[in-house]
Amino acid sequence: MLTGCLSPDPVKFENKIREWVPLGTAAADAQRIMEHHGFECHFITTSNIFNSSGFDYLDCDREQVRFHDWSARFIFQDGKVSEYGRIKTN
C-alpha cells in the first residue's frame, strides 16, 4: 500500500485526488486507486435505501490518529467518474 504523506492543505489535497482519479475513470478503478493510497471506500448505488442523491457515488475516507482525516466523494454516470463531490481534510 502506498500511503505517503497527504497534505492537510485542502487545495493541495483536492489537486492530488483529481490527479489520482481523473474524470472518466471507471468506478472499479477509482476504488482500487483510492484503496491503494490507504483509503477505505464504500460504493453507494441508487438502489441503496440510504442514497437520496439520485446517483451512484464512491465515498473514500482515510483517518490517521493525531494527524488529519481525509475524505473524497466521486459521483458516477454510466459507471465512470463524472464529477467530484466533497473533498476535504479535517
Specify the residue positions occupied by each region the protein language model found.
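Bacterial signal peptide processing site
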Residues: 6-8
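Electropositive phosphate-/nucleotide-binding environments in soluble metabolic enzymes
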Residues: 11
